[in-house]
Design a protein with these regions (language model features):
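Metal-ion/cofactor- or nucleotide/acyl-coenzyme-handling active-site neighborhoods
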Residues: 1-210
Length: 210
């Protein structure tokens, strides 16, 4: 089993790209990420068709299913079952501890009521928050979110082929902004989001957000 401490500042000063699973990924190619340091949230990179450098997930099943040759970071206890990791822990899996493994829900706020546990990563309402924190932990100077859309494009709310999931866009929209604010304060990073179109008119595609 790898340790989170071993990953600290492994990519100091770099730009790190953090993938959510939103529909804007449908307008990107896997080749776009070939020369980039990437952190995938759950199955996002796998669904798009490339192998990221790191994966963060709240779910043991998805951490197990990811191929070798990349670091997988997950909670010591699975978010759904609340059970500890069963069996041997592979060398490419990092288990992080939390004081409480119950899902934090709508009240989550890293700035006030839910500061991330020291020497661990944020446990937010979305696995994306842990991915964002992992990028900062790795030493990123700049974090670029990809597919953190909090809405639909042409009626689609996920990248094509991704397992159907919840649509808590109002909640996630609020919490993503709180996570950004915390990272800027604690790490001095910049946090931006990729628009795969030429401008915010989306080349005629229709976005519906919160």
């Amino acid at each position: 089993m790898a340790r989170l401490e071993d990953l600290a500042s492994a990519h100091y000063g770099e730009t790190i790209w953090v993938l959510g699973s939103g529909p804007s990924l449908n307008f990107l190619t896997p080749q776009f990420f070939e020369d980039k340091t990437t952190v995938s949230t759950n199955l996002s990179a796998h669904t798009l068709g490339f192998q990221p450098d790191y994966v963060f997930s709240h779910y043991h099943r998805w951490a197990r299913e990811m191929p070798a040759r990349m670091e997988k970071v997950t909670l010591k206890r699975d978010t759904l079952s609340l059970e500890e990791w069963a069996g041997d822990v592979p060398d490419d899996v990092v288990l992080i501890e939390q004081d409480n493994y119950n899902p934090p829900g709508s009240a989550w706020n890293p700035l006030t009521t839910h500061p991330p546990k020291p020497h661990s990563l944020a446990y937010g309402s979305s696995s994306l928050h842990g991915s964002m924190h992992l990028a900062a932990w790795l030493g990123a100077a700049h974090i670029v979110l990809v597919g953190a859309d909090c809405g639909t494009i042409d009626g689609e709310h996920r990248v094509e082929g991704y397992p159907d999931n919840d649509k808590l866009w109002v909640l996630y929209n609020e919490h993503h902004a709180l996570m950004k604010e915390w990272l800027v304060r604690e790490y001095g990073v910049t946090v931006y989001s990729l628009n795969p179109f030429v401008n915010l008119n989306l080349e005629g595609h229709k976005f519906e957000g919160v």
